[in-house]
Amino acid sequence: MKDFLEDYKKSVSERGSEGIPPLPLNAKQVQAVVEILTKDPTNAAFAKELLIHRVSPGVDEGAKVKAEFLAKLSQKKLECVHISALEATTLLGTMLGGYNVEPLIMGLESQDKNIAKESAKALKTTLLVYGSFDKIAAMSKTNALAKEVLESWANAEWFLNKEPLNECIEACVFKIDGETNTDDLSPASDAFTRSDIPLHAKAMLKNRIENYEQRIKAIKTKGVPVAYVGDVVGTGSSRKSATNSIMWHFGKDIPFVPNKRSGGIVIGGVIAPIFFATCEDSGALPIVADVKDLKEGDLIKIYPYKGEITLNDKVVSTFKLEPETLLDEVRASGRIPLIIGRGLTNKARKFLGLGESEAFKKPSAPKSDAKGYTLAQKIVGHACGVKGILPGTYCEPKVTTVGSQDTTGAMTRDEVKELASLKFDAPFVLQSFCHTAAYPKPSDVSLHATLPGFITQRGGVALHPGDGVIHTWLNRMGLPDTLGTGGDSHTRFPLGISFPAGSGLVAFAAVTGTMPLNMPESVLVRFKGEMNPGITLRDLVNAIPYYAIKKGLLTVEKKGKINVFNGRILEIEGLPDIKMEQAFELSDASAERSAAACVVRLNKEPMIEYLKSNIKLIDEMIASGYEDKETLKKRRDAMQAWVDNPVLLEPDSNAQYAAVIEIDVAEITEPILACPNDPDDVATLSEVLADTTGKRPHAIDEVFIGSCMTNIGHFRAFGEIVKNAPPSQARLWVVPPSKMDEQELINEGYYAIFGAAGARTEVPGCSLCMGNQARVRDNAVVFSTSTRNFDNRMGRGAKVYLGSAELGAACALLGRIPTKEEYMNLVSEKLESQKDKIYRYMNFNLMENFRL
């Protein structure tokens, strides 16, 4: 006990010097607190405060110890002079759900009427009861308090007893001009601290603005709530840590939940869809409104019901809150609590024979004259058990596949615990370790050791560090025409559809097997024509924003930004026979368009080929000891069932789209690349070389071939171009996306070629793409095959081009961006005659002696 007190007070002092609270108590520490309460009266008052306020709720390991102790006190099996049986019952009611539910149900039958009543009172506000609902329902036939609990749930007292949003909210503006991406709010270099919300929040905006700590501190002294304001807010990764950081600085404490806050206000001219949804989930108020007349330090009034923002009693901006349920979401402390609570209310009403509740705002049916459905609308409809879902419709589709990666996995674990879940209802949940495998910090090593068991115990599947990028694996676990999600913005399945999300919603989807969705509109991109020699799929990826800019549907400028893709589904057709790995290049890059999701219309044949390969992969995973075996077997069987009867959904010919962009690939006669530092700022090779402003530098310092945007064909092509050439003029990084790609490239001799070229190779994984481990040199000019090129992402001050591996090879050879002629000559000489050999994909079922 003495050691615990000394260690804890030391931790309080150390973290206090950084302006942050101590970490929540772990199970061992909670056990020490319990011992102090029962054996050390001198420190009991301090220990009681820790037990009440410093233990995470739900099914956290510490919560189990806390609940067991309080249950013994409530049931009078143990006495503690500092906590009465009645107070213990009250404290059980603060733990949200999980380990506290069973003791509270038992309390309904207590001989002590006060404890029985207090148990009922606690259960009325406990939403995370899951299977225990049936137990309470059965009890209600003979137990008046159990019936009272059901009636309270049915009447939505848990919701109606919360204060609605005020008619007028006074706030002080904290404004970041231009675009704030999630890497600004949650720097990748600090990814290892993300689950420690207060510590991670200290890094918010450190790479974006000078004197960031002073600015944040100063704005909080105004004595009113702070509104985070920007022209474009939340683009980029799906990391919930970005939202967590804003809420830690500007939100409100959550009673009895340590080191976490909710609430907060975000106002943006454009708010990226994943970030917007994460704000909804977390109880924040996201508002899309013109912000040009708002300046830092302005004391504004926000009228959420009228949709006005005033400054000095003058209206400076107007808005309409969307979705319609947003006010309910804020009142319920978030969209996820609202969905869970609303479901509990409906379940109780159904059991009691009551009609639908009138307590909640009902989403209006969309007004549409649409006669048909797009492919995306049909896939979502299929997940909802209907023919299709029109834009504007609120729905809760079934989630078939869920992904979690390591830099968000610890947060997802915490969210699963808070949801009081011991089992996943989603059919397939995959956890990877791709962002931290190469250079793990001590916290990463701990995560690698503890997170796999947490996932597999709940029926999920855990990969190993070094296996490779999550998307390379998760794509192979998908099923045609099904819906999924994942805690990474590049969760963009090439078959079916996926809506990436923050870790809170990912946890919800994994736990419940469903996710909330306000169905977006779709933008159709239709390719036609024949590709010219030397043109790659990556050029088609960059052609999408290139042609959108031509049509006035996309602007690079952030102020008053136009982006037709933002928050919509990108639907792609016209390339029906490309391989699944190629289709993923297209769907993956929809993240950089800020699209909500993407679907690629393909024929059956590439899907059948892909699934046959994936069935073999799963067989080898089972043979190699990957867990959970039953989950893997079920997914393998589902794949085989589809291969045996391959039927695909098709869009209706009269489906309606928000916009249609037609791209004749025959018009593309040279590579298209994204320029520093904006994935929307695309230009042809000739346009880049014609730029003499210095904004598009021509000399290349470093080249990166890797990320989820690559497949084995890219590495072969790169190898063939640099083979037998002098060592690269640029610093060269080569990192395959999976250990299967790595082994095959070694077998084929390409690693020898990479070594001769002077390449630095790493274990399969994300490598430079996220910039959370190894980074390029400060101020380097980089050519990369990775996903995005935000400021400071790959390296401080780095200027990053995005394009194909083939163009990257030319840059590596020359140490500069080649001319169109130089590039075409290289491709023609090195690749054209052996394209079929180079661009072969990983069909494991056809590979002799394939083993993991």
From Swiss-Prot:
Residues annotated for substrate binding in this entry: R194, S237, S238, R239, Q405, D406, T407, S489, R788, R793
Cofactor: [4Fe-4S] cluster
Keywords: 4Fe-4S, Iron, Iron-sulfur, Lyase, Metal-binding, RNA-binding, Tricarboxylic acid cycle
SUPFAM superfamilies linked to this entry: Aconitase B, N-terminal domain, Aconitase iron-sulfur domain, LeuD/IlvD-like
CDD domains tied to this protein: AcnB, AcnB_Swivel
Entry's cofactor comment: Binds 1 [4Fe-4S] cluster per subunit.
Protein name: Aconitate hydratase B
Organism: Helicobacter pylori (strain ATCC 700392 / 26695) (Campylobacter pylori)
Name of the gene this protein is made from: acnB
